[in-house]
Amino acid sequence: MSAIKDDERSHTLVRPRPQTVIGKDTARDITDMMIAAVKDGEAKWTRLPGLTVAGKTGTAQIPDQGKYQENKTIASFVGFAPAEDPRFTMLVVLWEPQTSQWGSETAAPLWFDIARDLVYLLRL
């Protein structure tokens, strides 16, 4: 499809050309580091049975009137699986989580809950 047309208007669709942002070796290195973060790091319990998960936790302080306050954070977890041939990628971001300030304790568990359902739905 190259355009959308109706009786009054026509819109040409522009398809961006794919671009290589990082090389294959760099992508593999980053994936390996993300696999290690799940296997041996803060996000150990985001592992899914029978699948290799690549992921990374994140915790950032939110500035408040020019200063950072320890209890105001953004917690996150990004991951994809299976790492060798991803079928899904997901980012979970929580602003000012209440139970813990850390992405490994808040965003990662939520990611795991959703990922477990995706594994079932996608029959991985």
Enumerate the predicted regions with their spans.
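Amphipathic alpha-helical transducer elements in NTP-driven molecular machines
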Residues: 23-27, 71
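Short surface loop/edge beta-strand patches of beta-sandwich-type extracellular domains
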Residues: 16-24
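Active-site beta-strand/loop architecture of penicillin-binding DD-peptidases
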Residues: 1-17, 34-123
